[in-house]
Design a protein with these regions (language model features):
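Alpha-helical transmembrane segments of multipass membrane proteins
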Residues: 15-23, 47-51, 83-87, 91, ...
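Juxtamembrane interface at the cytosolic side of transmembrane helices
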Residues: 161-185
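Alpha-helical transmembrane segments of multi-pass membrane proteins
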Residues: 3, 7-11, 15, 74-83, ...
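Membrane-helix interface/capping segments
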Residues: 55-71
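Functional transmembrane-helix hotspots
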Residues: 89-117
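Short membrane-interface loop/juxtamembrane segments of multi-pass integral membrane proteins
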Residues: 113-139
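Individual transmembrane alpha-helix segments
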Residues: 131-154
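Transmembrane alpha-helical insertion/packing segments
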Residues: 1-58
Length: 185
């Protein structure tokens, strides 16, 4: 099970890392008009499709065609953690080496958007305080790691749950008992 988790986690993580490292290039090509959320979550879903493949591979090749919901979920969770960790690591490289002003630009864009919206003064002030709080928290590397995991890991967990529900397969006790002549009349 560990080898299966490692292989499919690395495949998923390499895909996510390649996406993260290419996002600054894509933003420059599209002159900032790239909807990063849609593209980002689409890339996460594609990368985490390896959770389904890895869980099915574990069930069919290593577990005699059977897997419980719990086993399938643990396989998916392991793949998610490895893939998410590579995503976080690549974001840290991108952020600290190539985009150290990312949070300043992102906060400025959020503030401008909030000021252009038609919010009441109280709501606007709450939004601005929230943006400034997030920006100051992002100065701490631990918070950068936590925020980045919170961005990617929930997607992996949801896909792990869905994969476990679809792929769970318990042995049929009646059929195996009859086939092994263990049936009592």
């Amino acid at each position: 099970m560990k080898k299966n988790i490692l292989i499919f986690g690395l495949v998923s993580g390499v895909f996510l890392a390649a996406f993260v490292l290419s996002i600054s290039f894509l933003s420059k090509v599209f002159h900032g008009h790239l909807d990063n959320e849609v593209v980002g979550y689409s890339a996460m879903i594609i990368a985490f499709s390896f959770i389904f493949v890895g869980t099915r591979n574990f069930r069919d090749k290593y577990n005699q065609g059977m897997v419980t919901f719990g086993q399938a979920f643990l396989v998916g969770l392991g793949i998610s953690l490895i893939g998410s960790s590579l995503y976080v690591g690549s974001w840290l490289i991108e952020f600290y080496c190539f985009m150290p002003d990312y949070m300043d630009k992102y906060s400025a864009a959020l503030i401008q958007k909030a000021q252009q919206s038609h919010l009441s003064p109280e709501t606007l002030q709450k939004r601005l305080d929230s943006i400034n709080s997030m920006s100051s928290m992002y100065k701490n590397p631990v918070m950068v790691v936590l925020f980045t995991y919170m961005e990617v890991l929930p997607v992996g967990i949801v896909i792990s749950l869905i994969s476990a529900l679809i792929l769970k397969r318990k042995p049929r006790t009646g059929a195996t008992d009859y086939a092994n002549n263990n049936v009592s009349y």
